[in-house]
Amino acid sequence: MVAMAAGPSGCLVPAFGLRLLLATVLQAVSAFGAEFSSEACRELGFSSNLLCSSCDLLGQFNLLQLDPDCRGCCQEEAQFETKKLYAGAILEVCGUKLGRFPQVQAFVRSDKPKLFRGLQIKYVRGSDPVLKLLDDNGNIAEELSILKWNTDSVEEFLSEKLERI
């Protein structure tokens, strides 16, 4: 059985064609320097903490066709980063998976989150630990996987990025 979906002309086309169309559109958008949303990057198979230096390595593995998507999803390494405070942050975790990340669990269940203005703990089913930094309008400015961070790293990072109470 082949999955079918309505195409642009109303005709039924294989769902694979829609994925190909989506990939083509995303490549066209990336050619104009636009960044993809974190959801689109995950759909394309890229991590939320992908560094642009990783995209430079694609040629070594004959994967240059992935370069435009990689560039649309990557984050530049901060060479001369100025200290920027964000308006808030959301630490997303799955309550049922939290035990697999004892360091993040220790941070979430401690009093430390109360020390940071604008920090919210959000339980999202199935989510690995992710930290979303918010701009002044409440939009996601940065998204980082904190999968392997320890309690001190989370606290230190938040001390640099959020205002302490």
Swiss-Prot record:
Gene3D superfamilies (alphabetical): Sep15/SelM thioredoxin-like domain, active-site redox motif (3.40.30.50)
Entry annotated with the keyword Amino-acid biosynthesis: no
Gene source species: Homo sapiens
Keyword Signal assigned: yes
Tissue specificity comment: Higher levels in prostate and thyroid gland.
PTM comment text: The N-terminus is blocked.
Listed Pfam families: Sep15_SelM
Function: May be involved in redox reactions associated with the formation of disulfide bonds. May contribute to the quality control of protein folding in the endoplasmic reticulum. May regulate protein folding by enhancing the catalytic activity of UGGT1/UGCGL1 and UGGT2/UGCGL2.
Family, as annotated: Belongs to the selenoprotein M/F family.
Alphabetical UniProt keywords: Endoplasmic reticulum, Selenocysteine, Signal
Name of the protein this chain belongs to: Selenoprotein F
Main localization category: endoplasmic reticulum
One GO process term, biological-process aspect: 'de novo' post-translational protein folding
Compartments (UniProt record): Endoplasmic reticulum lumen
GO MF, one example: selenium binding
PANTHER family the record matches: SELENOPROTEIN F
Record GO cellular component, one term: endoplasmic reticulum lumen
Assembly information from the UniProt record: Forms a tight complex with UGGT1/UGCGL1. Interacts with UGGT2/UGCGL2. Interacts with RDH11.
InterPro entries registered for this protein in UniProt: Sep15/SelM_sf, Sep15_SelM, Sep15_SelM_dom, Thioredoxin-like_sf
Signal peptide: 1-31
